Amino acid sequence: MSETQNTQTKRQRTLVGKVVSNKMDKTVVVLVERRVKHPIYGKIVMRSAKYKAHDESNQYNEGDTVEIAEGRPISRSKSWNVVRLVEAVRII
């Protein structure tokens, strides 16, 4: 039984969201929106949450769509890491 537990790895939580702030050093704030059905009225409503994610090279800008993954706590409010850039913001 212990062999099967060792071979199975825990899946890492990943989310996709939009960078809303990159003013902190090595940190971006990512807004993640999800659609939920209202429990009483049945209407689909948008729920959102902001996550602080670690950006080691300060390469992501406001408006970029990024994928973040949960990791070990880096600070009091930061326990997510930016994995990859999904879509860059278009500057006109």
Swiss-Prot record:
Keywords: Ribonucleoprotein, Ribosomal protein, RNA-binding, rRNA-binding. The keyword rRNA-binding applies. CDD domains: Ribosomal_uS17. GO terms for biological process: translation. InterPro entries: NA-bd_OB-fold (IPR012340), Ribosomal_uS17 (IPR000266), Ribosomal_uS17_bact/chlr (IPR019984), Ribosomal_uS17_CS (IPR019979). One of its GO terms (molecular function) is rRNA binding. The keyword Cell cycle does not apply. Pfam families: Ribosomal_S17 (PF00366). GO terms for cellular component: cytosolic small ribosomal subunit. Belongs to the universal ribosomal protein uS17 family. One of the primary rRNA binding proteins, it binds specifically to the 5'-end of 16S ribosomal RNA. Part of the 30S ribosomal subunit. This is Small ribosomal subunit protein uS17. It comes from Bordetella petrii (strain ATCC BAA-461 / DSM 12804 / CCUG 43448).
